[in-house]
């Protein structure tokens, strides 16, 4: 974790690092002013929002990275598909080698991997059979393609809370209950894209990793969500549902790591959460190689991690999101496996169902009115 990231997530700056704070505070003020001005333009209608012609549900967050948006997007998309909807997920495609609009999955076939699409769209495509996944910088254009070309009648906007150019019928904001706002500052002084007051735009707050949160802090977050949205939050835990080989094609069984010595290999915003997941599976974490979020492991880095694991009498274990970035030959290495995570709802399933149904009804009415 870099010096700036440690400051973001509430670690005290060392004496030699405190010199970074002054320029970061100045930059934070500029960022705050820009974000406020842009938000005011949308709030006033001076910046217009495009309508997709079908219901749109956004999954987003306030802080950058690691809140649990991807498991939430998978859970919401699956629930919409279970309602008989033809669902398409629209993602920016962070880390992709191409910046044009791309169909990652048409719902029947996965067409692109993580290299061209980015790790999150590639993972969504693999985890959501029957759901289309598109990626590109202009979500309004992706929406048009999803509706007119792929026949989608419901859209999930991945990481869409700040992407206000596309109108939505429900904003779901995901907060990591264990550390929702870091040090409380905006970028680049802290991890937040907007002040927490932005939660008033949300229709539903989703608290992830509630099993890792302090109960007093959790009660405060529940009160914050209720005050902001008028509705109690959805609450979930990151549940490890399977251990799979590095190609993600073969299940090794959820108990495969119980009692095993492992080296945690990840490219995540919050690697500590992955270590806790491994502990929950009964593994003994004897080493770690943690890289920045969306990092693509080089051959040298992967070889070093595998050698270190072998030297410690351990197995290298990575996340499903990291594994999709691996070249097929490297993913097939038998010394490597991955953990598959789902968002397991522990509270608020009824709130989620009501919010989704209301958003679908609202979007359908607006679509008929526009037509």
Swiss-Prot record:
- What's one GO-annotated cellular component? plasma membrane
Q: Name one Pfam family in it.
A: LpxK
According to UniProt, the reaction catalysed is: a lipid A disaccharide + ATP = a lipid IVA + ADP + H(+)
The alphabetical list of record keywords is: ATP-binding, Kinase, Lipid A biosynthesis, Lipid biosynthesis, Lipid metabolism, Nucleotide-binding, Transferase
- Known EC number(s)? 2.7.1.130
Name the positions where ATP binds. Answer: 63-70
GO molecular-function terms, A-Z: ATP binding; tetraacyldisaccharide 4'-kinase activity
Q: Which top-rank group of organisms is this from?
A: Bacteria
Pathway note:
Glycolipid biosynthesis; lipid IV(A) biosynthesis; lipid IV(A) from (3R)-3-hydroxytetradecanoyl-[acyl-carrier-protein] and UDP-N-acetyl-alpha-D-glucosamine: step 6/6
Query: What's the stated role of this polypeptide?
Result: Transfers the gamma-phosphate of ATP to the 4'-position of a tetraacyldisaccharide 1-phosphate intermediate (termed DS-1-P) to form tetraacyldisaccharide 1,4'-bis-phosphate (lipid IVA).
The UniProt similarity line reads: Belongs to the LpxK family.
Q: What is this protein called?
A: Tetraacyldisaccharide 4'-kinase
Gene that this polypeptide is encoded by: lpxK
